[in-house]
């Protein structure tokens, strides 16, 4: 068995490629032996980032997104509060590369590809870094889920229900969102 899937998810303060990122969740795993929800939480990559540093570096905040965050539950809003655990966004790519390991043949999925990948591309371009995965292996989680639903003739929205995971699911938490997508695609 080898790790052949990487799922990523950002939580942000906007929708543009140069938006401030609040957190990044990721999991690398073998599709033939996918992790449980709890295993994603235990083994996944999760970092929160300093907002002030990003604003000083010219990353942007969208007021409508900030307003949207204000309407989310307090579990989700935890990411808005500065924490001693916040790291520099400049450390994100090296840490993610270390977590991922060998990326040859790894398919990298995001929900949606035009959002998460554009943010990563903006960061690596600005910082003169390299993508932590092979760009030609980028995939869209929504498309995969949609095809799966159509194949099984399930008439549900793209965010279809998943069985009880035995842990509290936190919406709009990057690592929990990744865990939900692991369950959906496996």
Residue ranges and their predicted role:
Residues 2-6, 11-110:
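Conserved non-catalytic scaffold segment of RNase H-like nuclease domains
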Residues 122-127, 147-151, 184:
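Active-site catalytic microenvironments for nucleophilic, acid-base chemistry
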């Amino acid at each position: 068995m080898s790790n052949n899937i990487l799922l990523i998810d950002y939580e942000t303060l906007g929708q543009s490629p140069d938006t401030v990122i609040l957190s990044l969740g990721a999991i690398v795993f073998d599709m033939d032996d996918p992790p449980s929800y709890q295993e994603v939480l235990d083994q996944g990559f999760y970092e929160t980032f300093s907002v002030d540093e990003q604003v000083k570096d010219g990353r942007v905040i969208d007021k409508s997104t900030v307003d949207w965050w204000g309407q989310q539950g307090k579990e989700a809003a935890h990411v808005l509060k500065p924490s001693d655990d916040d790291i520099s966004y400049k450390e994100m790519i090296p840490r993610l590369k270390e977590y991922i390991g060998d990326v040859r043949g790894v398919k990298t999925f995001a929900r949606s590809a035009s959002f998460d990948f554009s943010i990563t591309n903006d960061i690596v371009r600005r910082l003169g870094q390299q993508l932590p995965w092979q760009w030609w292996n980028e995939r869209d989680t929504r498309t995969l889920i949609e095809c799966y639903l159509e194949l099984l003739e399930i008439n549900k929205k793209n965010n279809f229900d998943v069985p009880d995971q035995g842990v509290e699911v936190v919406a709009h938490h990057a690592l929990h969102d990744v865990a939900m997508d692991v369950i959906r695609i496996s």
